[in-house]
């Protein structure tokens, strides 16, 4: 029930969905837009063996739904792709739309990358009011590596960094649990090889971009994309030690 546009980068892909017909997919997209407007709707975690993943999660007492198959058709190239999904309840994921996916067809073709284009997803930002509960789910149950857990005294909060597939789930929260455990997506940070070239290219085509500035991470420079992001806070980042 949806029309999808897929943008492939080195370590993941961004999938944009729009409702086009009746069906569960269209119902989901419409519900997200009705509730929050356009923006970041969900996170897909790839697995090479979705049946084994479901079994392992069951052994860890993690409730899962049935594995469901999906298919998509590229009407322009007359190509199809197939996959299997394992969805998790919003009660488990504390409000986030999270699911596991196993691709059955060939890998998506990567886009041609120049120094002024995005080469990979650097990190996705999530807000939480229950950092300990987030660690319990994503590290202890999902098995995602927690690389760093730090307290930031400057603003009285806590930051968690989960690493997988050359990207990071960056979690920002309060020091202690506050109310009903709730997580929410915030934004995306994309890595580029040459931020000045990317900034110039975007400005030339009418995209509003902030001035380049030093990033919070040492030896990085960043800029904020301020238009055309469809409600998704978007940062571009260059690692200066490449």
What are these regions (language model features)?
Residues 21, 25-34, 176-178:
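ER-lumen resident redox/N-glycosylation machinery signature
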Residues 39-50, 55-57:
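A generic, well-ordered mixed alpha/beta core segment in the N-terminal half of proteins
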Residues 114-173:
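Aromatic-anchored, glycine/proline-accented short structural segments
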